[in-house]
C-alpha cells in the first residue's frame, strides 16, 4: 500500500471524507488523493516522494510559485514578533493601501480570513446599504459556502451532482434569484419584474468554479447599467480572478467598475486572507462607523498580511502579467493542438494566469454548456496526466492556474505528457 493510501485511510477515521475541502477527495475522478509533503516553485512532492507539475497552485493563491524566497523571507521576519494580536498593526494599513492602489474601484477595504467571509460580508453590507433583501446570482458561480449563496453554485456541488446544498433553509434560499450566466435577456427580465427589490447582484466576472467561463462584455456591461439604474449594488467576486487575469483584476480587463469587490487567494500569498471593499459611501455602513456588523478574530492576521504584501509587490514587476498570460495561453493552445492531432474532441481557453480544459468541441459560455463535457474522458485524461507527473484539478468543473514559476521546461513536459495521454484516449 502506498503512503498516500495509508494516509487517506487514516484521515477518513477522523476527518469527514478524509479531507477538509470536498474536491480534494478525488470522488469525482476516482482513485487516491495525493497527500502533499512539500512544494517548491511549480512543483510539489507527494507522500510517496513523487514530483508533480502543479496546475492548481492551492486553487489560485500561488501566483509566484510555491515558497518564493521573497514571500518566505517576509513571513519569517514577522514570525519572531508574534503570530496574532487581536489589535491593529501598521501592516494592515499597508496592505489596504496596496489594494486600493491596484484596484481603483476600492476606496476602502476590510480584511477577512476567507473568500466565504468576504462574499457573505459584502452581501450583508449591500442589504444594509439598500434596505432590500433579494440577491441575484448566476448558475455555476460559486461564492463560498454561505447559505444564501449555495444555490446552483457549481464547483464542488457540481462535482458531486448536487446543484444546491442540503441544509439551506427554504426561507433563506427564497431571497436568492438565480439566472443563467451570460444571458442578458434573462437579466433584463428579472430587473423589469422586481428590480426595486434587488439589494445586490454578485457575479464572478471570470468564473472559475464551473471550470473557466468568461463573462461576455455585453453581459457585464448590462449588469453595470441595470444595477445602477435600479439602485442595486454590483458585487464583483474576484476571489479567484483578482490579480490573476490582470494586475487590477477582471474589472481592469473589462473596463467595468463594480460597487463592491471581493478578493482572496492571491492577497494572502498562500495564507488564509481575503478582503472586500469598494465605494466609500457603502463601506461607511460597516461597524464601527455604521450599523452593519462584521468582525473576525484573525482578520488582518500579521503573518497572512506579510505573505500577501510580498506577493502583491512581486506581481507589480514590469511585464509580470504579460509573461504569465503568454505562458498560460501557450499551455491552453498546446493542449488543444495535441488533442486535435489525436482526434479527441477537446477545447481550451486561457485568460491571464487562469485556464480551462473542456472535453467538448466548443469553449463553454454557461453552466449548461459546461455540463455537456465528457466526464468519463476527462477522468481518464486526469489519471493519465497524474501518472505522468502532471497535477490538474481533480474535477472537470474547476479552472487551472499557472504561476510565474512555470517555465518552458515545465510547459514542454506537460505538453509531451498530454500528447501521450490524448493518444491513449483515442486508442
UniProtKB/Swiss-Prot annotation:
Q: Which GO terms describe its molecular function?
A: glutamate-1-semialdehyde 2,1-aminomutase activity; pyridoxal phosphate binding; transaminase activity
Q: Where in the cell is it found?
A: Cytoplasm
Which Gene3D superfamilies does this entry report, sorted A to Z?
Aspartate Aminotransferase, domain 1 (3.90.1150.10), Type I PLP-dependent aspartate aminotransferase-like (Major domain) (3.40.640.10)
Catalytic activity, reaction form: (S)-4-amino-5-oxopentanoate = 5-aminolevulinate
Please give the biological process terms from Gene Ontology that the record holds: protoporphyrinogen IX biosynthetic process
Keywords (A to Z) from UniProt: Cytoplasm, Isomerase, Porphyrin biosynthesis, Pyridoxal phosphate
Modified residues annotated as N6-(pyridoxal phosphate)lysine in this record: 265
Cofactor field: pyridoxal 5'-phosphate
Subcellular location, principal: cytoplasm
Q: How does it assemble?
A: Homodimer.
Name this polypeptide is given: Glutamate-1-semialdehyde 2,1-aminomutase
| Source species of the chain | Burkholderia mallei (strain ATCC 23344)
Query: What's the name of its gene?
Result: hemL
